[in-house]
């Protein structure tokens, strides 16, 4: 997948994740006004935190509760937003709204998962979205591998053909799936060839299409 590196350089063979969401300020936001089915423009009342122009472009606006819940729309464009001046902000989406919204509808925001990736930290702050295949300069665009054979930093002892998850001990690495500790973690792939800890093993990635 094509995306943008975040504010720090990343070397090859590292697991990367999407940057952490803004959180509560852009979650459970109510619709500013009722929105009819078929519309692509949706205005919401944010709970805080300013938004730069097109910060959420190619990201997602979804209805998480009440009328219209279950819909997820990809954002095309929006203006800058100063929350202290006006809590409302309008988003233009690519797809039409299928079910109408009311002012009780609750909506949430997510930036494009590939808009500013970071090395996957040992404490999860977002989903893993790929692996770097070359050294990448900070804030540059490039490709992140999501499937097939990839050399990936290894933490601990992994097993041939066994599933691997992101490491909780070394940022950007994979480790063997521990069913006691990692049963609900995101499985990133299966081991094709085992190399020693701190080296790079060959992993068949299953992160995404």
Predicted regions and their residues:
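Extracellular receptor-binding modules and their adjoining Ser/Thr/Gly/Asp/Asn-rich linkers
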Residues: 1-53, 65-209
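Short conserved beta-strand and strand-loop elements enriched in small hydrophobics
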Residues: 58-65
């Amino acid at each position: 997948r094509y995306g943008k590196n975040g504010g720090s350089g990343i070397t090859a063979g590292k697991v990367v994740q999407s940057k952490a969401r803004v959180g509560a300020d852009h979650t459970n936001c109510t619709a500013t006004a009722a929105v009819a089915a078929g519309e692509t423009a949706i205005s919401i009342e944010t709970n805080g935190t300013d938004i730069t122009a097109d910060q959420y472009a190619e990201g997602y606006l979804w209805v998480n509760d009440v009328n219209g819940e279950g819909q997820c729309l990809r954002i095309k464009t929006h203006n800058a937003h100063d929350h202290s001046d006006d809590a409302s902000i309008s988003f233009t989406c690519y797809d039409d709204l299928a079910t109408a919204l009311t002012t009780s509808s609750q909506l949430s925001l997510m930036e494009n998962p590939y808009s500013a990736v970071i090395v996957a930290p040992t404490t999860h702050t977002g989903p893993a979205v790929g692996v770097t295949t070359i050294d990448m300069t900070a804030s540059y665009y490039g490709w992140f591998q999501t499937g097939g054979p990839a050399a990936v930093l290894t933490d601990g002892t992994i097993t041939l053909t066994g599933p691997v998850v992101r490491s909780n001990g070394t940022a950007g690495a994979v480790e063997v799936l521990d069913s006691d500790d990692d049963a609900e973690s995101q499985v990133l792939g299966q081991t094709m060839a085992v190399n020693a800890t701190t080296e790079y093993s060959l992993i068949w990635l299953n992160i995404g299409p």
